[in-house]
Amino acid sequence: MKAVRNLLIYIFSTYLLVMFGFNAAQDFWCSTLVKGVIYGSYSVSEMFPKNFTNCTWTLENPDPTKYSIYLKFSKKDLSCSNFSLLAYQFDHFSHEKIKDLLRKNHSIMQLCSSKNAFVFLQYDKNFIQIRRVFPTDFPGLQKKVEEDQKSFFEFLVLNKVSPSQFGCHVLCTWLESCLKSENGRTESCGIMYTKCTCPQHLGEWGIDDQSLVLLNNVVLPLNEQTEGCLTQELQTTQVCNLTREAKRPPKEEFGMMGDHTIKSQRPRSVHEKRVPQEQADAAKFMAQTGESGVEEWSQWSACSVTCGQGSQVRTRTCVSPYGTHCSGPLRESRVCNNTALCPVHGVWEEWSPWSLCSFTCGRGQRTRTRSCTPPQYGGRPCEGPETHHKPCNIALCPVDGQWQEWSSWSHCSVTCSNGTQQRSRQCTAAAHGGSECRGPWAESRECYNPECTANGQWNQWGHWSGCSKSCDGGWERRMRTCQGAAVTGQQCEGTGEEVRRCSEQRCPAPYEICPEDYLISMVWKRTPAGDLAFNQCPLNATGTTSRRCSLSLHGVASWEQPSFARCISNEYRHLQHSIKEHLAKGQRMLAGDGMSQVTKTLLDLTQRKNFYAGDLLVSVEILRNVTDTFKRASYIPASDGVQNFFQIVSNLLDEENKEKWEDAQQIYPGSIELMQVIEDFIHIVGMGMMDFQNSYLMTGNVVASIQKLPAASVLTDINFPMKGRKGMVDWARNSEDRVVIPKSIFTPVSSKELDESSVFVLGAVLYKNLDLILPTLRNYTVVNSKVIVVTIRPEPKTTDSFLEIELAHLANGTLNPYCVLWDDSKSNESLGTWSTQGCKTVLTDASHTKCLCDRLSTFAILAQQPREIVMESSGTPSVTLIVGSGLSCLALITLAVVYAALWRYIRSERSIILINFCLSIISSNILILVGQTQTHNKSICTTTTAFLHFFFLASFCWVLTEAWQSYMAVTGKIRTRLIRKRFLCLGWGLPALVVATSVGFTRTKGYGTDHYCWLSLEGGLLYAFVGPAAAVVLVNMVIGILVFNKLVSRDGILDKKLKHRAGQMSEPHSGLTLKCAKCGVVSTTALSATTASNAMASLWSSCVVLPLLALTWMSAVLAMTDKRSILFQILFAVFDSLQGFVIVMVHCILRREVQDAFRCRLRNCQDPINADSSSSFPNGHAQIMTDFEKDVDIACRSVLHKDIGPCRAATITGTLSRISLNDDEEEKGTNPEGLSYSTLPGNVISKVIIQQPTGLHMPMSMNELSNPCLKKENTELRRTVYLCTDDNLRGADMDIVHPQERMMESDYIVMPRSSVSTQPSMKEESKMNIGMETLPHERLLHYKVNPEFNMNPPVMDQFNMNLDQHLAPQEHMQNLPFEPRTAVKNFMASELDDNVGLSRSETGSTISMSSLERRKSRYSDLDFEKVMHTRKRHMELFQELNQKFQTLDRFRDIPNTSSMENPAPNKNPWDTFKPPSEYQHYTTINVLDTEAKDTLELRPAEWEKCLNLPLDVQEGDFQTEV
């Protein structure tokens, strides 16, 4: 019944249409869409139903990237008489696009206007549409013309790269038929295709002529039967069945072509009136295809749609028991017409371009609109707003002064008669170059009162006077006078003066006013804190620049950086004006090359990096205009233009522009506008792309992905960004941010929603630095991740799908991270703000946060930033700094006091260096505390910083000076006054030079800031301290290594004598040290040991103090520059206190010299005769005597019974080996022996070389002493011993000495001039004794020692000498006690038995030294630093001699001349002497001539008894000075 009802309704509506007008049929429309077909043939009457004026026929290309559609139109003469056929192609099946295409009349082919019978067309886009158009005067319904059935269309889908054999055969058939019909005219048969080669005869294809005819009026659907017809070679599973199953029996209505007539299964219009005819055709079709083996057709299926034009399908099966194939199709479809019209919903058209700003200056508004296609047949209207507004800001408008409201009228000026009333108004201040208010500021009018009596009347008030002060409250006044008072009348009531306050604002203090400044070629005038100062922009820009004067935390006014947000460069301004002019003229054609050129120019400008903050806003405005122009012109930018666009965005978002963005966004939030521009541009690019096409854009700061996806093709979730993509930038490849877009977001809920809009443009953008330039949020909330954007057009309908977003944190230490998205509907200015609505935080840890969001937007992570601890300046340093600096200073001051008390004992270069070092540290600590309280005073802070810089460097340099001094001491370098001056230059001069250079170059800029009094951490000024300090540490390490190498390596000592002694240092008690504190008795082995000890102490001091010093000053710098951290202050206090304690321990408590000096101080070790004993010792050192040394000293003084002063001179006199002279005295008066006498202190020394006798029992005369003929072979290995003699033998010395003998190493004995008392003995005048009066004073007897001479040390354990014993002619000899040395051959030989018998009773003056013997081993090897004290300054390290020597014990009587004149004949007695090694040897020296026979007696003295010791010593060197 329902079908009958629909049929009756259809017939009735057709009847009404025929009866009441034909013209109404012109409003009917129909459309046909053919897809999934590779070949077809349709007649015009089949394609367009009769009497339908607005019909289209559309063919869809399966894949435009692979296939092309070839169209052939066979035209008859009368087929196009009543209408026109238009053919065109397009990519998107959109009514708006088609209307726009028809309106432009671009690329539309008029098929009926062709003069040829055949028209060939080729198309490569998604859709081909043929439209039948009737003229405007079309009369209405017409009969069907037979020519319409003869004119038909053929189309072919052909592979572009490898065409199939079937396709080429069809093309060649078209060409063959065209050539036949045109009688060989080839110009009208042009088919532009080169992949196919047509044979000369069609039979070569292997297809008969009958099959060629079957290609007309047939449709081949794309199914399993025809799948192989699209490929060049058939696969095993493919067939190309062109067949007789599509053949149809001849039918006159459809035209006869050969033996058969083939009819395509065409779609029909919903308004076609031939329903019965269709049913008849179907019946005939079923009958004529009912061959044996083929079952009957099934019933037609239900119509695919409930409204509008749909389709019906029926099928049949083939039963062929004999193995034959069935002919004809097995599936058939037809168009079903449903009378119910489908509702057409209202559709928004595209947004119109943004209008120009509503105002040319100031805050304006831009508007865009869109229109809605009205709904039909009950469709829904359009949803959403019709207009859209957004703010715009081009430039600041000049603000003119505006009058405020008038005040109320004042009281009448008089109380009687006519007076006046006044009122005034205020004018607001003009800004940005605006004009002042125009017009009067006051008005007056008359007022009428009763007539006055004879009393006085007030005149009008005068004007207010100027304010007495400009600030801090002043006063202004006005006056009036009283007139008209009669004699009997009354005076005016009231007062004639009125006063009021003015200028009540507080005057700024001098430190609250920013001084005049010159910056960036602009002069900034004095401005109170809180105000803005304005200036013109630089010459290359237009606009105004501003600079704010603000107060610091300490209440001091200071200039901020200038703001260039209103400055626009001339190049940017010119580019902006050129675009606005084109937009105003409406030149759409500029969208092509014009906009591309604009982006290239803007790219060049942004790559220069020298733009202002205002240029950023102009660049965003230019990009907005370019995007709007592309949208308006429907222009698709080229790939180069797209890349340039995103490169411009990357340049604008560079991290270097962070400060410029912060400055620019104080006027307008350009970063938010930039995000919106990028989204719009992405969709413009995406709409111009083909399906399944994607574009990946990668720059230094932006990664973007643009994809065009049909909804049905999205089978998996989409991930962004793609880490493994080729060419991915490093920061995006290493990024841990990602977003997962679910596939369900593209899939509609039901298949009924699939329409032409089911193709989506997906855009995703990852910004690297956008979080840095977004507007600052309140409540210490910051963007703590990269910003990622996901956008899809058209927007998908709301689903239950969630976007999975995972973002990595940028900063550690933030609190409460949470997910947000950008919501532009919550802001009053249409710019938007961050919102948590629609986004929830799923999982968060210390480095990542995972979110689930139900909408598309811009996503990020917000977190709470910990609040900074602001430490207010209290005007006093912290307690920690005070404690640390105080303890360090206390320790160093204690050290200085100790050194001052013991200075006479420990004065040396090392002590002077230490005092200077302590002074630099104490000064640094004091300046650190001062700098903490003077940050508000710039001049004092700058001065404090400069001195702090100086003393910090000085402390490092004095450590280096100590290392240098140790190195020179170890290597034995001579240190003169010039060298000591270099110590001062290194310790104080080098830091002063560095600081002066730094201050000169920087002009004190950076010396002190608003927060601390130290070198600024910006600009590299800190390297003025770090660089020299690091260099000092490096050099100190090198010197330390060299010193250590010298101390541990004997081969490292170049000096022969030092090297020899270095070999003896392995035995610490190898020698005996004799120190007579007042007579200058010292040991030669003491120098090397003491020098090494001091060097090791200095080396250990450098290794400990220098790292501690570096740690202390490093923590001091951190404590001064970062007051918020208490850790650095604690570290400084610990290191600084430890530094002072270590210095006191190393240089005071553990230093041996200080210990000895302190003991001596407690024992009052001072000369009782001369309190000032410092001049008696080398280099001002007070010799600290041990018990043994005191015994020697007491013995010496008990005999002398007088001042030891002369002995001191003799002590100095005895230093003859390479002493250090004054630097202001040059060596002069050098004798032929190479020894300078005039320069020695006292000028009393000369020497005589006395040859050693070969035999011990042979007497020695003065003639033998004066014999200069010395054998070279005997002198090469000899050693020397010096004895004080008189000056009258100086000539003899000169004759004896030879040049080669002067260079020999020598040992010395210095005899004092006044230390021995000599008296002649009247009883023994005939006896020849050596007396000090006959023996020349102040002379040195130089003895040559035979290297072969040896002594037996055990024999001399006990030996006493008697000066009263008479000497025999040859047996009794002058005996000398010798000490055995392994390094030196002893030079005395005699029969030990003759002298061993000497007893202590024979010599009354012999003193037993048993107490000294008991302590002999204790003081056998005491090392000391030998220094000399000259008449102008202290001498430096004294280089000792490297020779073994023995001390003369006493002199005896000299044998007579007769005994001495009997030498061995023909032989030198010295040459024949062969001493036995088992005896202790003595040498008898005949000093005087035979003519000098004065009998002298050499009395034993106390000091001689000190020396008369059986010294049992081992290998070692020592030198005794008396």
UniProtKB/Swiss-Prot annotation:
Residues 1-25 form the signal peptide. Glycans are attached at residues 51, 54, 82, 105, 241, 337, 418, 540, 625, 779, 812, 828, 937. Disulfide bonds join 303-336, 307-342, 318-326, 357-392, 361-397, 372-382, 412-447, 416-452, 427-437, 467-502, 471-507, 482-492, 514-549, 537-567, 819-851, 839-853. GO terms for molecular function: G protein-coupled receptor activity; GTPase activator activity. Residues 30-159 form the CUB domain. The endogenous protein is proteolytically cleaved into 2 subunits, an extracellular subunit and a seven-transmembrane subunit. The chain crosses the membrane at residues 881-901, 911-931, 940-960, 982-1002, 1024-1044, 1099-1119, 1126-1146. SUPFAM superfamilies: TSP-1 type 1 repeat (SSF82895). Residues 902-910, 961-981, 1045-1098, 1147-1522 are cytoplasmic. The keyword Ubl conjugation does not apply. Residues 26-880, 932-939, 1003-1023, 1120-1125 are extracellular. It is found in: Cell membrane. Residues 819-869 are annotated as: GPS. Pfam families: 7tm_2, AGRB_N, GAIN, GPS, HRM, TSP_1. Its main location: membrane. The modification Phosphoserine is found at residues 619, 1220, 1411. GO terms for cellular component: cerebellar climbing fiber to Purkinje cell synapse; plasma membrane; postsynapse; postsynaptic density membrane; synaptic cleft. Brain-specific expression. Keywords: Cell membrane, Disulfide bond, G-protein coupled receptor, Glycoprotein, Membrane, Phosphoprotein, Receptor, Repeat, Signal, Transducer, Transmembrane, Transmembrane helix. It comes from the Eukaryota. Residues 291-343, 345-398, 400-453, 455-508 form the TSP type-1 domain. GO terms for biological process: cell surface receptor signaling pathway; maintenance of synapse structure; motor learning; myoblast fusion; negative regulation of angiogenesis; neuron remodeling; positive regulation of synapse assembly; regulation of dendrite morphogenesis. Residues 693-869 form the GAIN-B domain. Forms a heterodimer, consisting of a large extracellular region non-covalently linked to a seven-transmembrane moiety. Interacts (via its TSRs) with C1QL1, C1QL2, C1QL3 and C1QL4. Interacts via (C-terminus) with ELMO1, ELMO2 and ELMO3. Receptor that plays a role in the regulation of synaptogenesis and dendritic spine formation at least partly via interaction with ELMO1 and RAC1 activity. Promotes myoblast fusion through ELMO/DOCK1. This is Adhesion G protein-coupled receptor B3.
